Every structure is written in C-alpha cells, then in structure tokens.
C-alpha cells in the first residue's frame, strides 16, 4: 500500500560527516523497515530532474551543486503511516527549528545542509523511490 512506504536520501553533508550509520540506526529504531538501499552519486542531470519542482526558485542552482558534490544514500522505507511518521522523525527543514531528538536536530548543519530528504506525500514517495530504484531493487 502506498501509505506504507516513503523515500529518503541521506544527503552529501551527512555522508561526508560519517552519519550514515547513526541516521540508519535512528530510522530502524523508529520502526521503519528498509526495503531498498544504495550508496550512489547524483549527476547534475539527476539532481536537476529530481528537484525540477524547485527549478524556478532562487536556491535551485545551489541545491543541485550541493546534491552532486558527493555520494548520497537513497532508501525506501516501510512502516504504517510512513510519510507522516518519517517527516516527524526527520524534523523541520531548518535544524534550528527541529524538535530535539530528530534527525535534522542531531545531524544537520543548516537549512541548506539539512542531512536528509523525506518525501512529502505518498504520491511523491512513489515517484522519488522509482527515480532511484528499479522494481527488482525493492524488497
């Protein structure tokens, strides 16, 4: 069911700072099951396509540059109410506004380098997951 899965990326800043293990531990400790996982690097074209919804925003160029500067960890997660529960787990986009104990409060540096991406809807979770994973890569 769509509402049982969400998509996340551990962004280049968190990968560079060695936070993959801590973030994945927090995700699984919160009841999510990892159904797809890979370390990869987005090309400029990948990032421009993935973030196309933001292409008119003033931060688009910086976002693409940031997301292509190093590897990311892409994952599809499964849990009842996955999208909403994961967005609660990661916290506000700006780590200064994120609740204590959230992933962004623990691992993000700034609003621009905020450690993780989380899908904002069931529909986007499906689209974003399919962008990074073929059907045979999901379990």
Curated annotation (Swiss-Prot):
<keyword id="KW-0418">Kinase</keyword>
<feature type="binding site">
    <location>
        <position position="11"/>
    </location>
    <ligand>
        <name>ATP</name>
    </ligand>
</feature>
<feature type="active site" description="Pros-phosphohistidine intermediate">
    <location>
        <position position="117"/>
    </location>
</feature>
<keyword id="KW-0546">Nucleotide metabolism</keyword>
<dbReference type="GO" id="GO:0006241">
    <property type="term" value="P:CTP biosynthetic process"/>
</dbReference>
<feature type="binding site">
    <location>
        <position position="93"/>
    </location>
    <ligand>
        <name>ATP</name>
    </ligand>
</feature>
<keyword id="KW-0597">Phosphoprotein</keyword>
<dbReference type="InterPro" id="IPR036850">
    <property type="entry name" value="NDK-like_dom_sf"/>
</dbReference>
<dbReference type="InterPro" id="IPR001564">
    <property type="entry name" value="Nucleoside_diP_kinase"/>
</dbReference>
<keyword id="KW-0067">ATP-binding</keyword>
<feature type="binding site">
    <location>
        <position position="104"/>
    </location>
    <ligand>
        <name>ATP</name>
    </ligand>
</feature>
<dbReference type="InterPro" id="IPR034907">
    <property type="entry name" value="NDK-like_dom"/>
</dbReference>
<dbReference type="GO" id="GO:0006228">
    <property type="term" value="P:UTP biosynthetic process"/>
</dbReference>
<keyword id="KW-0963">Cytoplasm</keyword>
<comment type="similarity">
    <text>Belongs to the NDK family.</text>
</comment>
<feature type="binding site">
    <location>
        <position position="87"/>
    </location>
    <ligand>
        <name>ATP</name>
    </ligand>
</feature>
<keyword id="KW-0460">Magnesium</keyword>
<keyword id="KW-0479">Metal-binding</keyword>
<dbReference type="GO" id="GO:0046872">
    <property type="term" value="F:metal ion binding"/>
</dbReference>
<dbReference type="GO" id="GO:0005524">
    <property type="term" value="F:ATP binding"/>
</dbReference>
<feature type="binding site">
    <location>
        <position position="59"/>
    </location>
    <ligand>
        <name>ATP</name>
    </ligand>
</feature>
<protein>
    <recommendedName>
        <fullName>Nucleoside diphosphate kinase</fullName>
        <ecNumber>2.7.4.6</ecNumber>
    </recommendedName>
</protein>
<comment type="function">
    <text>Major role in the synthesis of nucleoside triphosphates other than ATP. The ATP gamma phosphate is transferred to the NDP beta phosphate via a ping-pong mechanism, using a phosphorylated active-site intermediate.</text>
</comment>
<keyword id="KW-0808">Transferase</keyword>
<dbReference type="GO" id="GO:0004550">
    <property type="term" value="F:nucleoside diphosphate kinase activity"/>
</dbReference>
<keyword id="KW-0547">Nucleotide-binding</keyword>
<dbReference type="GO" id="GO:0006183">
    <property type="term" value="P:GTP biosynthetic process"/>
</dbReference>
<dbReference type="Pfam" id="PF00334">
    <property type="entry name" value="NDK"/>
</dbReference>
<feature type="binding site">
    <location>
        <position position="114"/>
    </location>
    <ligand>
        <name>ATP</name>
    </ligand>
</feature>
<comment type="subunit">
    <text>Homotetramer.</text>
</comment>
<dbReference type="GO" id="GO:0005737">
    <property type="term" value="C:cytoplasm"/>
</dbReference>
């Amino acid at each position: 069911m769509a509402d049982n899965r969400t998509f996340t990326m551990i962004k280049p800043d968190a990968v560079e700072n060695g936070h993959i293990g801590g973030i994945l531990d927090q995700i699984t400790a919160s009841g999510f099951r990892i159904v797809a996982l890979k370390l990869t690097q987005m090309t400029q074209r990948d990032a421009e396509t993935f973030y196309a919804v933001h292409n008119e925003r003033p931060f688009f160029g910086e976002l693409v540059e940031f997301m292509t500067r190093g590897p990311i960890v892409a994952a599809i997660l499964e849990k009842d109410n996955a999208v909403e529960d994961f967005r609660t787990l990661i916290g506000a986009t700006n780590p200064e506004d994120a609740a204590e104990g959230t992933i962004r409060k623990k691992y993000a540096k700034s609003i621009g380098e905020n450690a993780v991406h989380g899908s904002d809807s069931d529909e986007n979770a499906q689209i974003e997951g399919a962008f990074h994973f073929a059907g045979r890569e999901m379990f």
